[in-house]
Amino acid sequence: MIKLLFMGTPQFSATVLKGLLDNPAYEILGVVTQPDRAVGRKKDIKVTPVKQLALEHGISIYQPEKLSGSQELIEIMGLGADGIITAAFGQFLPTLLLDSVSFAINVHASLLPKYRGGAPIHYAIMNGDKEAGVTIMEMIKEMDAGDMVAKASTPILETDNVGTLFEKLAIIGRDLLLDSLPAYLSGELKPIPQDHSQATFSPNISPEQEKLDWTMSNQEVFNHIRGMNPWPVAHTFLEGQRLKIYEAQLAEGEGLPGQVIVKTKKSLVIATGQGALSLIVVQPAGKPKMSIIDFLNGIGRKLEVGDIIGR
């Protein structure tokens, strides 16, 4: 039985971890995940999906704010793991830790060397890519730059958003890891170096990127909305208040960027730099997420054709 240390945080990671837990060839000695966070207006404490899964299986949990130089690092290195598996962990691994095990493998949600970094799925959708994928790679000190063990891809559908694509890639990543790890550990599967000259990056989404730019084409704004759903969520402004936009559909029509060009009891169409978008699901400031019909029956009632949002 191969003894593993698992490191990850979101549901993507938990899906990979569950695959390892269900496989009798591996024993998870401990998991390292991000600290619990206070979320929402009530500041409720939220544990990571990886921690929740570890709790259910009675696995030791480590949650250092920063792994390097921490007491947890010393404890983790004392577990005697054969190797490390990471998936969307969210921190760099200290060289000391990498050197303490026989192997360290990362499950990364992109077709490397494209989209190294923390938000590959967001950028794949926002940039209008036709496919996304997962790369199983060796861990080195440089971010997502290690040799590649295996790759798998899947089409990005017009109906996909970050949430749906995360779910698909998590399953692909889980299966790809379980399929390739035995051959890698036996030496049968030889890693392939990345072409570093082709590397692109996907840094974490900044608050500035969440704001919609209505001067872009309708396809670009549509992709941007999908690439922010369900987190961190794209937004515009209505009378100085933030209006989050979760879903929209491509529409025809012309007008000034951000201008209301169609308003009925059931639809609201906004002009973009080229074409238009029909808003489907929105969330006004201080209100729950709602359909555009409910929005037009409430706060959106005051909107008129010719009004401009986003200012």
Curated annotation (Swiss-Prot):
Keyword annotations from UniProtKB, A to Z: Protein biosynthesis, Transferase
NCBIfam families membership: fmt (TIGR00460)
HAMAP family reported for this sequence: Formyl_trans
Keyword Transferase on entry: yes
Gene3D superfamilies reported for this sequence: Formyl transferase, C-terminal domain, Formyl transferase, N-terminal domain
InterPro entries: Fmt, Formyl_trans_C, Formyl_trans_C_sf, Formyl_transf_N, Formyl_transf_N_sf, Formyl_transferase-like_C_sf, GART_AS, Met-tRNA-FMT_C
Known EC number: 2.1.2.9
Residues that, per the record, bind (6S)-5,6,7,8-tetrahydrofolate: S110, L111, L112, P113
Family, as annotated: Belongs to the Fmt family.
Database matches in SUPFAM superfamilies: FMT C-terminal domain-like, Formyltransferase
Name assigned to this protein: Methionyl-tRNA formyltransferase
Iron recorded as keyword: no
Primary role: Attaches a formyl group to the free amino group of methionyl-tRNA(fMet). The formyl group appears to play a dual role in the initiator identity of N-formylmethionyl-tRNA by promoting its recognition by IF2 and preventing the misappropriation of this tRNA by the elongation apparatus.
Catalysed reaction, written as an equation: L-methionyl-tRNA(fMet) + (6R)-10-formyltetrahydrofolate = N-formyl-L-methionyl-tRNA(fMet) + (6S)-5,6,7,8-tetrahydrofolate + H(+)
Protein source organism: Streptococcus pyogenes serotype M5 (strain Manfredo)
One Gene Ontology molecular-function label: methionyl-tRNA formyltransferase activity
GO CC, any one term: cytosol
